[in-house]
Amino acid sequence: MDVNTLKSVYFIGAGGIGMSALVRYFLSKGKKVGGYDRTPSELTEKLIEEGAAIHYEESTELITDAFRDPATTLVVYTPAVPDTHKEFTYFRENGFEIHKRSQVLGMLTHAGKGLCVAGTHGKTTTSTMTAHLLHQSHVGCNAFLGGISKNYGTNLLLSDSSEYMVIEADEFDRSFHWLSPYISVITATDPDHLDIYGTKEAYLESFRKYTSLIQPGGALIVRKGIELQPALQNGVKLYTYSQEEGDFHAENIRIGNGEIFFDYVSPLGNIPNIQLGVPVSINIENGVAAMALAQMSGLTDEEIKRGMASFRGVDRRFDFKIKNDKVVFLSDYAHHPSEIKQSILSMRALYRDKKLTAVFQPHLYTRTRDFYKDFADSLSLLDEVILVDIYPAREQPIPGVTSKLIYDHLRPGIEKSMCKKEEILDVLSKKDIEVLITLGAGDIDNYVPQICGLLNKK
């Protein structure tokens, strides 16, 4: 089906961060857009305000006539939707063209030059930073992001003239195999989603296959030292990057007074005195990767410097909520042991003499089962850990798999406790908080406004 001739697009799972970018894209193209999501959220309410017809009850009766013609309606679904879903079954049994979100994204990106950021972690910030660099420059871009840009308040950026499309390339369910990147960054290959892949070897092979999809004439920029054996087509250049090593890296890093500056080193030309708009050490490496993509896309040095300094970050990615002399509070989406470790180390670099407390909500029973010792090792870098129950997302409980697996493997001597998420405000009210971070990809973020209110009263 030619997406340009569509009249209507129906989304099953419309409120997901990746799906919502496509909802906004088709609304911008004048299509009739509707769909289902399991629960209302701030994001679904915004989509409704923007023109989407979204409902929250699983019922074929709520599918309006605008979405009942198979000849003019495309159905898009997220892999988290079960085959037994009533609306999914209706569309499947009535001859509709049905595609995963990643397939539709692939259709849209084949025509342009895809700047794709893949990796177990770091891809949302790096892709959003890249999109900001291009969007504020003479080059411009379209961008489908996996988080809400704080510069623009959206996860979709559009351009009528740019051939570049910035994409967060998601490895879940092998979704990134539908893409056709022109240039790709791979930030990390730490095993994850073993409920899908089964083994570390299968996970790494999926990344290897992804590298084979990069178009001839393009490039792969890999974080130096990660476990990866690329399978590049002829004519694809290979580069490395990291914070302090690789073809692209940073030198003369200066951290102090709440600011970070560094000199950017590149085979395409060095740029001195880069200032990070979100001054946390983890963003030095993210910034190096984003600047490499920007340089390869034709941005000037001045455009890159201006864009790096004006980048405001991504919602729930090292997202400072309170930052004053009494208390610091931030929310972070980190949900894999490696990214949790990086987040904590970044906080340590900023607040060396402060007590660091985290509330962690594990995400998925399978991930907790597979990595509970690694989670405990990362969280043991904190002074205090408060664990809440596992957020199940798409999964059913697994006997014996609870947050206590992590709790029992934390280092001796660390302050630790467990509670229901509904009890978190009461628990925090009894503590002397200096620096607090909420960690996790579940619904712990729903408590952030109340936590802010509590801490501001102290």
From Swiss-Prot:
Family: Belongs to the MurCDEF family.
Any one GO biological process: cell wall organization
Keywords per UniProt: ATP-binding, Cell cycle, Cell division, Cell shape, Cell wall biogenesis/degradation, Cytoplasm, Ligase, Nucleotide-binding, Peptidoglycan synthesis
InterPro entries: Mur-like_cat_sf, Mur_ligase_C, Mur_ligase_C_dom_sf, Mur_ligase_cen, Mur_ligase_N, MurCDEF_pg_biosynth, UDP-N-AcMur_Ala_ligase_MurC
Pathway: Cell wall biogenesis; peptidoglycan biosynthesis
EC number, UniProt record: 6.3.2.8
Summary of the function given for this chain in its UniProt record: Cell wall formation.
Compartment(s): Cytoplasm
Protein origin, superkingdom: Bacteria
Reaction equations catalysed: UDP-N-acetyl-alpha-D-muramate + L-alanine + ATP = UDP-N-acetyl-alpha-D-muramoyl-L-alanine + ADP + phosphate + H(+)
Organism from which the protein derives: Phocaeicola vulgatus (strain ATCC 8482 / DSM 1447 / JCM 5826 / CCUG 4940 / NBRC 14291 / NCTC 11154)
Name of the protein: UDP-N-acetylmuramate--L-alanine ligase
One Pfam short name: Mur_ligase_M
Entry GO MF terms: ATP binding; UDP-N-acetylmuramate-L-alanine ligase activity
Major localization class: cytoplasm
Chain residues that bind ATP: 119-125
Stored HAMAP family: MurC
Any one GO CC term of the record: cytoplasm
